Amino acid sequence: MVFERDGSIAGKFRKMHIPDDPAYYEKFYFTPGDQGFEPIKTSVGTLGVLVCWDQWYPEAARLMALRGAEILIYPTAIGWESSDSEDEKQRQLDAWTTVQRGHAIANGLPVVTVNRVGHESDPSGLTNGITFWGSSFVVGPQGEFLYKAPADREVCKVVAVDMKRSEHVRRWWPFLRDRRIDFYSGLTSRFLD
């Protein structure tokens, strides 16, 4: 749910991609959203809200951008499973940050990513649970960091984002204009031969 300044509901988005990997067995509990990728118009701009696992799919970010999103927002709850090595933890965190910075660059839009912090035990007792890595961040339309939150504690921060800059970046790097859509039909196939 996205709320307007006066508390009214501006819109809603249902998570489209549901994970089923170690410590994240969400397919058992959730059904994928069925509303597609529609930005939400608000008094502060048009928001492309994508939830958690949706952040790994460039198609989702691109569809939001093509439909008029002025900023991408990713509310997230991601972390490390207890058996992950320190090297693996760093690789996962780097990949998570990089893919979303890539969405900003490829679409010429700022990205706001908010992530949970803290630890959640595994009620089954099969693992020691998940430690959420925090590290929320805001990047501009060229993927440049405007803010990075700490990994280990909650923070409430107002970050200034120059929304007009996206238009300039899109003129310098007209990725949306120069797409070869006449050759992208394979993107709607699960696999290609």
Ranges and model annotations:
Residues 3-5, 139-140:
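Short, acidic, Ser/Thr-enriched surface-loop or helix-capping motifs
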Residues 141, 160-163, 187-190:
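Short beta-strand-to-coil "C-cap" segments at the C-terminal boundary of structured domains/repeats
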Residues 10, 43, 158:
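Ligand-binding pocket scaffold of soluble enzyme catalytic domains
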Residues 15-29, 153-171:
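A short, polar/charged loop-to-alpha-helix boundary motif
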Residues 6, 12-13, 149:
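Short hydrophobic alpha-helix segments
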Residues 36-70, 76, 166-193:
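Cysteine/selenocysteine-centered motifs that mediate thiol-based redox chemistry or coordinate metal-sulfur cofactors
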